Amino acid sequence: MTADTPTTADIDLIQRILPHRYPFLLVDRVRDIEPFKSAVGLKNVTVNEPHFQGHFPGVPIMPGVTIVEAMAQTAAVMVGVSADLADKNFLVYFMGIDSCKFRRKVGPGDVLELHVTATRGKPGAKVWKFDGRAEVDGELACECSFTAMMDLPTSPPGEAG
């Protein structure tokens, strides 16, 4: 983290930090990054997302687990930006999800605001814990706590290290 640490991440920077790609890249922008502390992700929900074909035909509802994954991706971007991990083959693994509650349906046309706050973890730590909440137009859609392991491989994925 330096004085030049960005407070926002556009899709280009997000893709330089996260290994996720379509159809599993679930955050479009991250703003209000407070290094190693918190951030707000944005996810524009569109009818073109593949899960809407079967969840549910005629009544498209974003699966709750994808909302939680979007919060986790937001948290990973916050840590990745804070630690200057763009282009460094940064990986994050879910370790646990606690106290998850879904409060409203999310569907095409909604913009998810993904608020994440680190409750455990510090620069260089492998295990982090976060509180997250997802909102649509200021209305709570989901809230949970989750734990993740941050991993910085010594070689690109798929290559021997």
UniProtKB/Swiss-Prot annotation:
<dbReference type="GO" id="GO:0006633">
    <property type="term" value="P:fatty acid biosynthetic process"/>
</dbReference>
<keyword id="KW-0456">Lyase</keyword>
<comment type="function">
    <text>Involved in unsaturated fatty acids biosynthesis. Catalyzes the dehydration of short chain beta-hydroxyacyl-ACPs and long chain saturated and unsaturated beta-hydroxyacyl-ACPs.</text>
</comment>
<keyword id="KW-0441">Lipid A biosynthesis</keyword>
<dbReference type="GO" id="GO:0019171">
    <property type="term" value="F:(3R)-hydroxyacyl-[acyl-carrier-protein] dehydratase activity"/>
</dbReference>
<comment type="similarity">
    <text>Belongs to the thioester dehydratase family. FabZ subfamily.</text>
</comment>
<keyword id="KW-0963">Cytoplasm</keyword>
<dbReference type="Pfam" id="PF07977">
    <property type="entry name" value="FabA"/>
</dbReference>
<dbReference type="GO" id="GO:0009245">
    <property type="term" value="P:lipid A biosynthetic process"/>
</dbReference>
<protein>
    <recommendedName>
        <fullName>3-hydroxyacyl-[acyl-carrier-protein] dehydratase FabZ</fullName>
        <ecNumber>4.2.1.59</ecNumber>
    </recommendedName>
</protein>
<dbReference type="InterPro" id="IPR029069">
    <property type="entry name" value="HotDog_dom_sf"/>
</dbReference>
<dbReference type="InterPro" id="IPR013114">
    <property type="entry name" value="FabA_FabZ"/>
</dbReference>
<dbReference type="GO" id="GO:0016020">
    <property type="term" value="C:membrane"/>
</dbReference>
<keyword id="KW-0444">Lipid biosynthesis</keyword>
<feature type="active site">
    <location>
        <position position="55"/>
    </location>
</feature>
<dbReference type="GO" id="GO:0005737">
    <property type="term" value="C:cytoplasm"/>
</dbReference>
<dbReference type="InterPro" id="IPR010084">
    <property type="entry name" value="FabZ"/>
</dbReference>
<keyword id="KW-0443">Lipid metabolism</keyword>
